[in-house]
Amino acid sequence: MKKKFLCSTLAMAMAASMLVGCASESKTETTAAAGETTAAAAETTAEAAKAETNGEKLKVTLLVTGSFGDKAFNDSAQAGMEKLEAELGDKVEVNMVEMGSDKTKFEGSMLDACESDADLIITGLWDMKEITEKVAQEFPEKKFIIFDTDVDYTLGDLSNVYSMSYKQNEGAFLAGVLAASATKSDMEYANEDNVIGFVGAKDTAAVINDSAVGFIEGAQFVDPDVKVLVSYVGSYVDSATAKELAITQYSNGADVVFVAAGPASVGVIEAAAESKKYCIGVDSDQALAYEGKDEANFIISSAIKGVGDSIYNAVEKAVDGTLPYGEYQILGIEDGVVGLADNDIYQSAVSEDAKKAVEDVKEKLLAGEVTVDSAYGMDEATLKGIINGAQ
């Protein structure tokens, strides 16, 4: 299956392990520069990191939770590291470690990396948050990058850690534009009900609600009258319940459902194929996991987080001495790491008008003409108002 990013240049091998965000489920807004970190201190740290290599290759170790071959975050991270090796091989030395699924061994793997000759250690997801907060202070001479979450810079001296996560609300906004445009189109499985749906994992997870808010706002940007059904599985792994919720939404008129429910998303994809309706995946190009199977034909796109691109960009800055260690940055469309999957199914199944609508809105987002609200820091009353008002 041929694929590309609408908003990225790195062709990533991503699909349906469906790890939705994997960020903290706190509803508290995280600021981009926590604690007492200053721009001057970050610059000094970055320059020190550059000087540490003394003209030698920067030794970079990637630690992934789980294994490669997931066609999702891990494979994307691997692709980013391979791109580094191919394009910056004269400046970096790459090492990649699969930590497996036993969480009790994650800290040991991190300590092993710290005790090695690695200059820069990269890891990600909320499972590694507390470990990074602890170990980074024990090894101040090492540098760290953590993706899809952040560390709490108020806990101590974490000026050697760069945190980055992604504006999933922007990708979800484009998914909403696509869904609302598709339901009004003459696409094969579209109907005339002007109803679309969202199935999320937990209603207590800010990362899930961030996608819900973005999706609803994107849909309403296209048509303020579109109805958006919203359901929550209550779990990241209960695919049976996810399937039931999606079938109910399809039965109630939805012809496109955006799913952000982790591994439970499999149930929504099954429901789409059985109901002969459309779905939109999240985090990775989920159609890749179903290549050659009937289910792939109903996954018209996915809202993607470009982990591989962000790793490449961050390490490139680390090599140049410009990576702002001690800071947390949230990356979006303007950084080229958030967008919709553009593959052969998207090109063949989605109407030209819908594709044009997505492109037009993407340009508006890039130009700053359109902004998307975030569930992070949003009070519960406002959040519920957005969700209930859409239904």
Feature map (PLM): residue ranges:
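Positively charged n-region of N-terminal signal peptides that target proteins for export
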Residues: 1-10
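C-terminal motif of bacterial Sec signal peptides marking the signal peptidase cleavage site
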Residues: 17-21
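A residue-level marker of the well-folded mature domains of exported/periplasmic proteins
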Residues: 24-391
